[in-house]
């Protein structure tokens, strides 16, 4: 899943001449360690791991701000995601760029299909993949 998403992003970035910073390590072990005691509450830990890493990468790279593609998904807990991102910004001293991209979700999916992009069917974690086969997706608001 991670490799498929990463490869698609790298191809797109190259096609539009977009500089891209990519972590080569998916970080499965740190993620599993972080969520082991509360698998059902894993999303906040995942958000923390991902957004703090993005903020730190922005700081290390001398960027003015950071954001996340997670903000386009209606399937994520948007408010929690935003709160974690602002905490990461405060702790790293790098501005967090906030925009609610959810209204563009369907158009983005359509465009991605037109371009032949890989479209994931779940958030990407192994627990979410399991849930994907157990119950229908629900949209969080």
What are these regions (language model features)?
Residues 1-141:
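Nucleotide-activated chemistry modules centered on ATP-dependent adenylation/adenylyltransferase
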């Amino acid at each position: 899943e991670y490799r498929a998403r990463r490869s698609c992003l790298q191809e797109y970035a190259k096609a539009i001449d977009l500089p891209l910073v990519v972590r080569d390590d998916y970080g499965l072990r740190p993620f599993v360690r972080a969520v082991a005691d509360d698998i059902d509450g894993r999303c906040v830990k995942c958000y923390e791991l991902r957004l703090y890493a993005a903020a730190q990468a922005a700081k290390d790279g001398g960027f003015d701000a950071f954001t996340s593609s997670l903000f386009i998904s209606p399937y994520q807990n948007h408010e929690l995601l935003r709160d974690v991102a602002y905490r990461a910004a405060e702790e790293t001293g790098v501005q967090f760029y906030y925009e609610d991209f959810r209204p563009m979700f369907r158009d983005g999916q359509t465009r991605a299909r037109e371009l032949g992009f890989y479209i994931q069917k779940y958030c990407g974690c192994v627990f979410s993949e399991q849930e994907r086969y157990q119950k229908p997706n629900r949209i969080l608001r």
